[in-house]
């Protein structure tokens, strides 16, 4: 059921706050790159976020939360966080990969009904929320990722 209210920020686990912090940092960076007419840098930043952080870390570390039984607040938070990331990424990449972004966006909103627009190109471009950016948390997680990568490389 996609009508559940969003889980409060303070009740979200640290891993959700981390990926949403990175997402807000990404929105800020991509907006700056596009304003500076640097679409290649914007595209690379989006790709790095999706591949390195969303897919390789967030989704992998949260498999149990996604597949656990029952719809707990923790599971709802995980689903809402992932949905927010995917919807925002679709909007961010719309100027760079218009057809793919539109298909991703339409597939998401067809299920949830959260946006009443016919295309990602008719939706508002994301605006970052500075209060959701936690550079300390981002740095701590980056350190954990670096250590994990070093151990795996041995």
PLM regions with names:
Residues 1-31, 60-150, 154:
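Acidic, turn-prone loop/beta-hairpin segments
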Residues 50-51:
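Hydrophobic residues within the alpha-helices of tandem HEAT/HEAT-like
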Residues 43-47:
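Aromatic-lined ligand-binding clefts that engage carbohydrates, nucleic acids, or primary amines
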């Amino acid at each position: 059921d996609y009508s559940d209210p969003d889980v409060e920020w303070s009740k979200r686990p640290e891993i959700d706050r981390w990926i949403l912090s990175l997402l807000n940092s990404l929105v800020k960076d991509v907006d700056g790159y596009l304003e500076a007419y640097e679409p290649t840098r914007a595209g690379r930043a989006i790709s790095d976020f999706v591949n390195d952080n969303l897919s390789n870390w967030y989704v992998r570390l949260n498999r149990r939360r996604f597949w656990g039984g029952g719809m707990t607040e923790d599971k709802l938070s995980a689903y809402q966080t992932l949905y927010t990331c995917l919807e925002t990424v679709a909007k961010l990449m719309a100027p760079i990969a218009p057809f793919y972004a539109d298909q991703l966006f339409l597939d998401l909103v067809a299920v949830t009904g959260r946006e009443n627009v016919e295309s990602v190109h008719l939706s508002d471009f994301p605006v970052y929320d500075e209060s959701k950016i936690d550079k300390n948390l981002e740095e701590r997680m980056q350190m954990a990722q670096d250590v994990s990568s070093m151990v795996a490389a041995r």
